[in-house]
Amino acid sequence: MSKYLIINADDFGYNPQQTKAIDELMRGKLITSTSLMTVAPDAANAAELARLGGYPVGVHLTINSDDSKNRWQSNSGAPSLSEKGMGLYESQVGLALHARRRDVRAELEAQYNFISSRGVEVDHAEIGRAHV
């Protein structure tokens, strides 16, 4: 059985700078996969780069926002995951107090569909930090 090392770059789509850096690393074959954060501002651009490059891509499951100034928006529009008019909860406590199981499930499915509907095959899922 052969062995190989997987080097995955996290947070593809987080912002234009990070998207560009990950794209360059993928094209240079310095990393072997990436995880796309579909609720982040540059997600659509990252998905298009992944499709064009044929990159191995996972979905970075995210149900809260890291950015307090520019709150990320839900892919599903699930009401219990967002503070009124502000986007996804920044606080894990706020999320835990309000999130409904069916909304969490709908959001995770919407994040998978965000990628797959753009012609990119999702080959793994990732959860990190406090996102899920």
Predicted regions and their residues:
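CE4/NodB-like, metal-dependent polysaccharide N-deacetylase domain
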Residues: R102-I127
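A short alpha/beta connector and helix-capping loop motif
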Residues: P16-P41
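Conserved small/polar residues in nucleotide/adenosyl-binding loops
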Residues: A130-V132
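Boundary/entry segment of secreted carbohydrate-active catalytic domains
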Residues: M1-P16, I22
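Active-site gating loops and adjacent loop-to-helix segments of metal-dependent hydrolytic enzymes
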Residues: S68-L97
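Acidic (Asp/Glu)-rich catalytic clusters
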Residues: I22-G28, A44-P56, Q73-S82, S117
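Active-site beta-loop-alpha junctions enriched in small/polar residues
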Residues: D10-F12, M37-V39, H60-N64, G128
